[in-house]
Regions:
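Conserved beta-hairpin
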Residues: 61-76
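Conserved acetyl-CoA-binding loop-helix of GNAT-fold acetyltransferases
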Residues: 98, 104-117, 140-144
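A conserved beta-turn-beta hairpin within the catalytic core of GNAT-like acetyltransferases
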Residues: 71, 81-93, 103, 123-125, ...
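Residue-level recognition of the GNAT/N-acetyltransferase active site
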Residues: 94, 99, 132
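C-terminal "cap" of GNAT-fold acetyltransferases
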Residues: 3-10, 16-17, 125-167
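A short helix-loop-beta-strand connector motif used in the catalytic cores of GNAT acetyltransferases and
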Residues: 53-65, 92
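Conserved GNAT acetyl-CoA-binding A-motif
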Residues: 112, 119-130
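Conserved GNAT-fold acetyl-CoA-binding loop/helix
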Residues: 16-19, 23-53
Length: 167
């Protein structure tokens, strides 16, 4: 397990089978879900129960937990993908969250450093993420880390993230 310590901050790769890591994952993700940028609704009891075991079954899923003084304060959930244009793997960041009250302390930056190190170790050509257009604080952070809109040709515009919920 790789660990980075900065002022009692530890970033570790989550073990989905470890009860402490599973509980930390649910705690931080639930705080994110309750935030307006996460939808403003807590995770259902069913999701809370199934989350870690389900992630353990997804090939290429990995997560990093941030703990400050041993307490969970941040999370990044990622999935391996593939870039057809580069014919190489990529890492897609699905969730990045820091507990309210702990933001602005460099926790997200430390999570991104761990993600990018992991991506390089896995031979990824890039790291991708989605962000709500109104999440200005996150967008400022991501831009400061070198992330930006995806576009192939300025005349074609930037990529959009669309979804269709299946029932």
């Amino acid at each position: 397990v790789s660990e980075t310590a900065v002022l009692d901050l530890a970033i570790t790769r989550a073990d989905f089978a470890d009860p402490a890591d599973a509980a930390a994952l649910v705690l931080v993700l639930d705080a994110y879900a309750c935030d307006p940028m996460g939808g403003g609704e807590p995770l259902s009891a069913d999701v809370r129960e199934r989350l870690a075991p389900a992630l353990a079954q997804v090939p290429g899923a990995f997560a990093f937990l941030a703990r400050l003084g041993g307490e969970p304060v941040g999370l990044a959930t990622c999935f391996m993908g593939f870039s057809t244009f580069a014919a190489r793997p990529l890492v897609g960041i699905h969730d990045v969250s820091v507990i309210p009250g702990q933001r602005g302390k460099g926790i997200a930056r430390a999570l991104f450093a761990a993600i990018e190190d992991e991506a390089r170790e896995r031979g990824a050509c890039k790291v991708t993420l989605e962000v709500l257009s109104g999440n200005h604080r996150a967008k400022e952070l991501y831009a400061s880390l070198g992330y930006g809109d995806f576009q192939l040709d300025p005349e074609a515009g930037t990529a959009l993230f669309w979804q269709k919920r299946l029932t």
